[in-house]
UniProtKB/Swiss-Prot annotation:
Region Disordered: start-end pairs: 292-317, 366-607, 628-725, 756-801
Name of the molecule in the record: Phosphorus acquisition-controlling protein
UniProt subunit comment: Binds DNA as a dimer.
InterPro entries: bHLH_dom (IPR011598), HLH_DNA-bd_sf (IPR036638), MASH1/Ascl1a-like (IPR015660)
Length: 801
């Protein structure tokens, strides 16, 4: 059907077309009540871009296929005489096709995921007659279709965006479940330093591949949040990470950036490998720093060699001090430096250690000493200093290999005698065979170079012991303070670098030269050895030089060790001398111990008075009671009254106690018998005789005491409290014994009385029966007096009790 077939009169035949079309479009926009639209609609979405430029006939064909699959009238056929016909057809066609295709796509997604109800169209819409769909007027139909299509497309766009977000989230979680790396103890031990770099690199690569940064940021946030939650959940079920964490602790100190999959973008270049590489790089840097510290000694080589060419002693001092400082700074680096350095030191010095080479060097130095006196001492000294400081291969005389020569000679502690052997340098004296001037210069100037080695600097505390022997040399005086200044720095280095054999061996070299050439010296020129060195001047060094050097060196070693001990001994002796001097002084302390005044030669009595005054005034209670207080110190007025009341109350209580004691003693003295000695002696004698004896000695002693008391008292009354108490004690004991005897006799009397009553009852019964009362009465009369006596003596008391 062409567009010309549509006529205006056709619209007049359908007056209800407008309302019917509105109802149909509302039904079409009702998404929940729509049927299956895909069965009735079939569009090609790929021609959307080209449809904007198509002819009106293509739009009419698409509209015909949309609303009239079996043929019929067209809703979008342009009216004759209208200007909107050319614009309506292509736009309507494109928008409808786009909406239908989006609807079909969402229906498939919803059938798969069952997340949203299906969007379908109603079946009656397909069977709607074309007559009812046709609008009443062309303008109203066009407006209604445009509004309906716009609303439908807006709804479809919103649903499409929502569905796209859901699909992205589902795809993201599905990919995360496949790519998440569970945390392990190794991954937990990693440092989080390099994880930020990896995370940043991964995000940049993802941005280049995925798209704009706006989409990447929410994904990163979701990724970080999700992996952190999952790591905490997984870590609660993993075994113990460390002994300090209990299985019940679910919150572990985890570095979450390493759990993000972006950190594990490659199995080979993992953060663990990169972290290890960083650590190795740091270690390499440390090794570089340590190795860089060792060449400091090598840098000292040129100035040390330049000393041989430059004569002034100031340069030697400066280089020596710099060498000592460099050693002090690079002591730790020397420890951790490669082993090749000490090996090179040994190999470099071995050809120079032969005694022949040393003799040649000495011979070469001897003529130079004769020519140039200021330069000659620096030649061997600079070489020895370079040997100790820089280990030079050409100009070093440091005889390390002479350690082998010293061992058969049985050297005691090797490191101690270095400076002494270096200062005298007797090997130059006999071979030089010159005047005494170079000999005097040699022991002085070699001492300048000897402190180059740290061990020699350590033992420079005793040059004061050697300075008196070497008087002619004027170089010792300026150098001794230098040695003293440089003494403690090598001390710490030596303790720290004790395992190093090099400084110890270099110190052994110079002592080793002495015994060998001292052995040759007395044989060739016996007169020369005494002047050059103070050690040779000793009488012990003359008989055998080879054996004399070890004897001298232990002495020097002991002297070095004892120097710190001699000082305190000297101090102690001074202290003792001061104590003895105080004792030898007039000794005021015992006489006037509290006095502060030191010496009062003529006023000893005045000093005693002052002491008594001080003792009297020292009592703070007395001052307070008298009101004499120290200026600036005020005491409350109640304190004096309290003190007085305390003292008076104490005195009263003490006096009352004494009065009670005295009154009690007086009362005891009155209760005591006037002549208790005889009665007590008789009582004791009677008691002992009655008990069977054996207490005569105790009774005699008591009688002696009582006689003495009688003599003292005169009238039997004790003259002292002690005698009164003693007499009271004896009297109490006597009374106790008498009471015990009386009780014993009373018991015996009661027992006899009971027996007599028993016998008397039996006798009366037998007498009445037999009639022999006269015969039985005679024994009773004989026995009755005994019973009466007993009753008289103790029976009465027993009955009373």
């Amino acid at each position: 059907m062409n567009s010309s077939s549509w006529s205006a009169p056709d619209h007049s035949h359908h007056p209800a077309l407008h309302t019917a079309a509105d109802d149909d479009f509302h039904q079409y926009l009702d998404i929940n009540d729509m049927g299956d639209l895909s069965d009735a609609l079939d569009f090609d979405f790929r021609d959307f871009g080209a449809d904007h430029h198509t002819a009106p006939h293509a739009g009419r064909h698409a509209a015909d296929h949309l609303l009239h699959p079996s043929g019929g009238e067209h809703l979008d056929t342009p009216m004759t005489g209208t200007d909107m016909s050319m614009i309506l057809s292509p736009v309507d066609h494109a928008m409808l096709r786009h909406g239908v295709q989006q609807q079909q796509h969402h229906q498939q997604q919803q059938h798969q995921q069952h997340q949203m109800p299906t969007i379908t169209t109603t079946a009656p819409y397909q069977n709607a007659p074309t007559a009812l769909i046709q609008p009443s007027t062309p303008s109203e139909a066009i407006v209604n279709t445009i509004d309906a299509q716009i609303q439908f497309l807006q709804q479809q766009k919103l649903h499409a965006q929502h569905q796209q977000l859901q699909e992205q989230q589902a795809a993201f979680f599905a990919s995360q479940q496949n790519h998440i790396v569970p945390p392990t103890p190794q991954s937990l031990e990693l440092t989080a330093g390099s994880s930020q770099n990896y995370y940043a690199q991964s995000t940049l690569s993802d941005q280049h591949h995925s798209g704009p940064q706006k989409q990447q940021q929410p994904q990163q946030a979701i990724d970080y949040r999700y992996t952190r939650i999952k790591d905490q959940h997984d870590m609660s079920f993993t075994p113990l990470v460390s002994p300090a964490v209990t299985p019940l602790e679910t919150h572990f100190p985890i570095d979450t950036p390493f759990a993000v999959p972006g950190a594990y973008f490659s199995p080979l270049t993992s953060p663990a490998l990169h972290a290890q590489n960083d650590a190795l790089g740091i270690i390499d840097q440390r090794l570089g720093m340590m190795s860089g510290s060792s060449p400091r000694e090598m840098e000292l080589e040129p100035p040390a060699m330049s000393q041989a060419s430059v004569s002034p002693g100031d340069l030697a001092r400066k280089t020596r001090k710099n060498a000592v400082k460099a050693r002090a700074k690079s002591g730790s680096g020397i420890k951790q430096s490669p082993i090749s350095k000490p090996i090179r030191r040994k190999t470099a010095t071995t050809p120079m250690l032969n005694p022949q080479a040393l003799n040649q060097l000495v011979e070469n130095a001897a003529p130079s000493q004769e020519r140039q006196q200021p330069l000659t001492p620096l030649i061997p000294t600079s070489s020895s200093s370079t040997a100790g400081v820089t280990d030079s291969e050409n100009g070093s005389i440091s005889p390390e290999n002479l350690n082998d020569v010293v061992l058969p000679v049985e050297m005691p502690p090797p490191p101690l005698p270095k400076p002494r052997s270096a200062k005298p340098s007797p090997f130059l004296a006999p071979q030089a065979s010159g005047s005494a001037v170079p000999i005097n210069l040699q022991p002085g100037r070699p001492g300048i170079a000897s402190p180059a080695t740290p061990a020699s600097l350590m033992k420079l505390s005793s040059p004061s012991n050697r300075n008196p022997s070497v008087v002619g040399t004027g170089s010792h005086d300026p150098m001794d303070p230098d040695h003293i200044e440089n003494f403690e720095l090598p001390d710490s280095i030596n303790f720290s670098s004790a395992p190093k054999p090099a400084p110890i061996i270099t110190t052994l070299g110079t002592p080793a030269l002495d015994p060998l050439q001292k052995a040759a010296a007395p044989l060739q020129t016996p007169g020369l050895p005494p002047p050059p060195s103070p050690a040779v001047a000793k009488p012990l060094a003359l008989p055998s030089a080879a054996l004399s050097s070890p004897q001298l060196k232990p002495d020097s070693a002991h002297s070095l060790k004892r120097t710190p001990q001699l000082a305190p001994m000297g101090r102690s002796s001074k202290k003792r001398a001061s104590v003895t001097s105080i004792q030898m002084s007039p000794a005021l302390r015992p006489k006037i111990s509290p006095s502060i005044k030191p010496l009062l030669p003529g006023g000893s009595a005045g000093a005693e008075d002052a002491a008594s005054i001080l003792l009297a005034t020292k009592s703070n209670y007395q001052r307070i009671l008298e009101g004499n207080t120290v200026p600036g110190v005020s005491y409350p007025s109640e304190l004096s009254t309290n003190l007085t009341s305390k003292r008076t109350s104490h005195k009263i209580a003490e006096q009352g106690r004494r009065n009670r004691i005295n009154s009690a003693l007086q009362e005891i003295a009155t209760l005591l018998p006037k002549a208790p000695a005889k009665e007590g002696g008789d009582g004791d004698g009677d008691g002992h005789s009655s008990s069977g004896g054996g207490g005569g000695s105790g009774g005699a002693d008591r009688e002696d005491k009582r006689e003495k008391d009688k003599d003292k008292a005169g009238g039997g009354i004790p003259n002292s409290k002690a005698s009164t108490v003693e007499m009271a004690i004896e009297y109490i004991k006597q009374l106790q014994k008498e009471v015990a005897d009386a009780n014993k006799r009373a018991e015996e009397a009661e027992r006899k009385l009971v027996e007599m009553k028993m016998q008397g009852g039996a006798a009366t019964g037998s007498g009445s029966s037999v009639g022999d009362a006269g015969d039985l009465g005679t024994p009773t009369t004989e026995a009755n007096p005994v019973v009466d006596e007993d009753l008289k003596s103790g029976g009465g008391d027993a009955m009373d009790e």
